């Protein structure tokens, strides 16, 4: 029984690891949210509470291609671009600002 729990843990960890292309470059879901397990969901949020929790968050209506377009897509619906952990019932408990374009 313990073996199955450990095997399941290792399997899910392997699935969560970022993939890389043939040149060894790690692929990211987007270029404007930080890498890792947190803050990977781009959302447009209405109200920011103390810079951490965001209320009334929605998925961007159009897929942004850069940090600048992410900001303009969210601004078009009157919201702020945020990179959040998985939201629960419209409330994103852990959020951060997107990575600025260099």
Curated annotation (Swiss-Prot):
Q: In which tissues is it expressed?
A: Expressed in the conidia, vegetative growth and induction growth stages.
Q: Where are the transmembrane segments?
A: none
- List the subcellular locations: Secreted, Cell wall; Secreted; Cytoplasm
UniProt signal peptide: 1-16
Its Gene Ontology cellular component terms are: extracellular region
For this UniProt record, the keywords arranged alphabetically read as follows: Cell wall, Cytoplasm, Disulfide bond, Secreted, Signal
Q: Which superkingdom does the taxonomy of this entry point to?
A: Eukaryota
Cysteines joined through disulfide linkages: 33-83, 44-74, 45-57, 84-95
Q: Does the keyword Protein transport apply?
A: no
Q: Does the keyword Transmembrane apply?
A: no
Q: Which Pfam families match?
A: Hydrophobin_2 (PF06766)
Description of what induces expression: Expressed on carbon sources that induce lignocellulytic enzymes such as lactose, xylan, avicel and cellobiose, with the highest expression level detected on cellobiose and the lowest on lactose.
Q: Disruption effect? A: Leads to a wettable phenotype and to a significantly reduced conidial production. Also exhibits less biomass formation but does not affect the stress susceptibility.
Q: Which Gene3D superfamilies match?
A: Hydrophobin (3.20.120.10)
Q: What does this protein do?
A: Aerial growth, conidiation, and dispersal of filamentous fungi in the environment rely upon a capability of their secreting small amphipathic proteins called hydrophobins (HPBs) with low sequence identity. Class I can self-assemble into an outermost layer of rodlet bundles on aerial cell surfaces, conferring cellular hydrophobicity that supports fungal growth, development and dispersal; whereas Class II form highly ordered films at water-air interfaces through intermolecular interactions but contribute nothing to the rodlet structure.
Q: Which family does it belong to?
A: Belongs to the cerato-ulmin hydrophobin family.
The record's note on quaternary structure and interaction partners says:
Homotetramer. Further self-assembles to form highly ordered films at water-air interfaces through intermolecular interactions.
Task: Kindly give the PANTHER family that the UniProt entry links to this protein.
Answer: HYDROPHOBIN
Name under which the protein is recorded = Class II hydrophobin 3
> From which organism does this entry originate?
Hypocrea jecorina (strain QM6a) (Trichoderma reesei)
